[in-house]
UniProtKB/Swiss-Prot annotation:
A GO MF term: RNA binding
GO annotation, biological process: DNA-templated transcription termination; transcription antitermination
Family note: Belongs to the NusB family.
InterPro entries: NusB-like_sf (IPR035926), NusB_fam (IPR011605), NusB_RsmB_TIM44 (IPR006027)
Gene name of the record: nusB
Designated name of the protein: Transcription antitermination protein NusB
Listed GO CC annotations: cytosol
């Protein structure tokens, strides 16, 4: 099945943030490596840049938003789960044109692709709680329909 340009962007952002979390490389170094990555030519580059640079720039604020929905310290999560949660939280707060269910579904799929066997269940649960806090009107409308 062909991946959408937006899915490709999220996959590359996950890979870039994974690298950033492990190595603390600069966003410029990560950018340069991603440009040579498989699938870069098919990605929505504007979305990729917005996510990658936005998450790195707002890391502390995003962690602060995620933490109340976690059952353990964020540094105890796998780097893949952390990267995916950061991306989804960034999208929930900055890409309100994207329905929250799409963001959660994309995060679950990214975790299935790059993470451990059951990490996607945890990510789904955390993001359900987080979406209710960050987008209460949208989540309530969905639950009432």
């Amino acid at each position: 099945m062909k991946k959408s340009a937006r899915r490709q962007s999220r996959e590359l952002a996950t890979q870039g943030l994974y690298q950033w979390l492990l190595s603390n490389a600069s966003s410029g170094e990560i950018d340069a490596q991603l440009r040579g990555a498989l699938g870069y030519d098919k990605a929505d580059k504007e979305l990729l840049e917005a996510i990658l640079h936005g998450v790195i720039r707002e890391h502390a604020t995003l962690v602060e938003a995620i933490t109340p929905s976690l059952d353990r310290p964020i540094d105890q999560l796998s780097p893949v789960e952390r990267a995916v949660l950061l991306i989804a939280t960034f999208e929930l707060t900055h890409h309100v044109e994207t329905p929250y269910r799409v963001i959660i579904n994309e995060a679950v799929e990214l975790t299935k692709t790059f993470g451990g066997s059951d990490g996607y269940k945890y990510v789904n649960g955390v993001l359900d709680k987080l979406a209710a806090k960050l987008r209460p009107a949208e989540t309530q409308a969905r639950r009432n329909s």
